[in-house]
Curated annotation (Swiss-Prot):
Chain's gene name: glmM
Matching CDD domains: GlmM
Active-site residues annotated for this sequence: S103
Enzyme Commission identifier(s): 5.4.2.10
Function description: Catalyzes the conversion of glucosamine-6-phosphate to glucosamine-1-phosphate.
Entry keywords, A to Z: Isomerase, Magnesium, Metal-binding, Phosphoprotein
Protein name: Phosphoglucosamine mutase
EC supergroup of this enzyme: isomerase
Residue positions, PTM Phosphoserine: S103
A single cellular component GO annotation: cytosol
Amino acid sequence: MSDKRRYFGTDGVRGKVGQYPITPDFVLKLGWAAGRVLAKQGTRKVIIGKDTRISGYMLESALEAGLAAAGLKATFTGPMPTPAVAYLTQTFRAEAGIVISASHNPYYDNGIKFFSYEGTKLPDDIELAIEAELDKDIECVESAELGKASRMVDAAGRYIEFCKSTFPSKLSLSGLKLVVDCANGATYHIAPNVFRELGAEVIAMGVEPNGLNINDQVGATDVRALQKRVVEEHAHLGLAFDGDGDRIIMVDHLGNKVDGDQIAYIIARDALRRGELKGGVVGTLMTNLGMENGLKQLGIPFVRAAVGDRYVMEKLLEKGWKIGAENSGHVILLDKVTTGDAIVAGLQVLASVVGSEMTLHELAKGMTLYPQVLENVRFAGDNNPLEADAVKAAVSEVEAELGSKGRVLLRKSGTEPLIRVMVEGEDETLVKQSALKIAQAVKDNC
């Protein structure tokens, strides 16, 4: 079996709807291939959730057909955050969980990602086994062994109660005014209820999904509307989730953005204050230098993993630590959950706000963010601009200018045809100029 993935990226199979591999016929076969592999594992039961994209209906049906042909039973949750599917997979003792979502991407993209029976990303060997099955022709099991489908009617209520259980029982959100932006995505019927039931006054936005407006000028990838609303409503803070509820960005009462690095810092510092910190914090190559320095001042260990929440998870398991994050808003808290969970992460920050009697603004000021500029350059074809001599020369020049007061990172996106150029340092003007210089070199060599 080849150890090179053809379809699975860093976060499952993803692409534009109607274009291979996000087509009904491929997804049907993917369901069958996954079913063939999972049927060998045990229960033959799979939990399937989705976000609010209009294409979710089509892909859900295709998956169901493929799984049934392989003899697996599918239980559908309807629109449900990705971490909720991970949780329900565990609690129902299912063989796997499947999420139909393209996370923070626009509505015209979609994807399929899998969770193991433990609520974690599938192991590499299972993904490779599924890919191997995709090369075969579909063979139905005998009619008497075909899988059935059912719907889980209380999925939302179960997950709401789970989220609330991660908030300290002695604390309440009473007296807090929150603006909650659900990105017109999978948290729209979950998150506002979680915070309300814990006592907060909630102003909800991004809670009117129509299949086409997921992540559209709302949510964790675009917090401008949230920033404006928090200030207008004189709210204590705002929380923004992405389309599938595994990313969170927060906004303080002044309208300042609080990203994944700052959120992880606040959670780690609060755990240290309570004497409950287990180990250190895992970030990524994109994590701001300010977070690393802020944690160092507190005596909290910090290491970087490759970009992608699966690599953060791998490093956490390797180190035996509990807190990991990406600045984009993936926050993994292994003492609470098995994967990135935006609502649960938000609740831990709120617990810090209430428990310390400090504002989010005050808590976030504990670390100083270095200016960081990210440029995305789209490319096509099989050429790798990162190998071009002109690009390497531009990087060398910038690194020499920044010296020890900054850093450069170039990488290919794991989910889109993009080269990501990141420059970080103390001098904001120099950082901006440097990022544009490298991005132009990449464009010229695409």
